[in-house]
Amino acid sequence: MVMGDTPSLDEIRKAQRADGPAGILAIGTANPANYVIQAEYPDYYFRITNSEHMTDLKEKFKRMCDKSTIRKRHMHVTEEFLKENPNMCAYMAPSLDARQDIVVVEVPKLGKEAAVKAIKEWGQPKSKITHLVFCTTSGVDMPGADYQLTKLLGLRPSVKRLMMYQQGCFAGGTVLRLAKDLAENNRGARVLVVCSEITAVTFRGPSDTHLDSLVGQALFSDGAAALIVGSDPDTSVGEKPIFEMVSAAQTILPDSDGAIDGHLREVGLTFHLLKDVPGLISKNIEKSLDEAFKPLGISDWNSLFWIAHPGGPAILDQVEIKLGLKEEKMRATRHVMREYGNMSSACVLFILDEMRKKSAKDGVATTGEGLEWGVLFGFGPGLTVETVVLHSVPL
């Protein structure tokens, strides 16, 4: 072969890249069958943790649960299991092995349930999946949950895997940002994205000196969500985007060190809230919006559809006030919070699913509540904020 026939690096690079933006081609969700009703949870929680003598603390916990706006939460861990593992019911007792035994098995399993639904909606053979991004804050293992899911689904051994452990609640935005870069930089790539979260790693009894831990016990829940992400959808086989991803950014908020911490210890994953998280987020959120939407000439935040990680109702309330958002902007977000609780990284993907389903049911013009442009926010330890600009698709 003569040198002149060899393509230039520029030509090779161009051929490797996709032409269009990354799109979300399918969404699937899954939850454990077991669930708790939030109004009944304080009685159950203080009984199962042998803490009924802590009457003042129980009243505080009741108020937390009442204010949470949550109706029900799915949880893999049942009363029977907790009775057999009393160390998990103490505030600080060595219990990591018992927790790991659950999550190492159940995190990939719940992820599989969501992935099977997403693959079915996508309608293509799973052999077309080129990349897998798996995210969980529940446990760690080698080989990881990404490997286990590859085996459970029967994906090709050559699928390119990325395992994200211990990121926390912002990571639903992170996986979208990564999937976008993978899909747009690898022509024909189809990325399976899975977030699977199980609270077996964080469940613990109450402590009257650590109310921040109780906040987590009032909010956290189990769930998994899966997406197929790809650029240049093949309409001849029925591929069609639900949303397109236009840009994605990540930032650490100023003066927020230690606002949310999680530490994996012998006692499981401990959770600490040390600062005014709703205040820090609401104070800084407009800067992220300006940076994301100035290039598009958009400055009316009510003209966007909204998908925000529902860390807790106070975060949503303060963001609404700070930005002057109409009440209906957070409808999909609040619906997921009410029906599922805070499923960490999986939440924003559940909200995407809720929004496209409700938009279709209501007969509006687009997958984004009839609007063209939208924003997805992930908030979590750091404080880290993920901002994804979304473009809806006509229905």
Curated annotation (Swiss-Prot):
Task: Tell me any Pfam family this protein matches.
Answer: Chal_sti_synt_C
Q: Give the pathway annotation.
A: Secondary metabolite biosynthesis; flavonoid biosynthesis
Q: Name one GO biological process term.
A: polyketide biosynthetic process
Q: Which reaction does it catalyse?
A: (E)-4-coumaroyl-CoA + 3 malonyl-CoA + 3 H(+) = 2',4,4',6'-tetrahydroxychalcone + 3 CO2 + 4 CoA
Class in the EC hierarchy, top level: transferase
Active-site residues are C169
Q: What is its EC number?
A: 2.3.1.74
> How is this protein named in the record?
Chalcone synthase
This protein's species is Cardamine amara (Large bitter-cress)
Species classification: Eukaryota, Viridiplantae, Streptophyta, Embryophyta, Tracheophyta
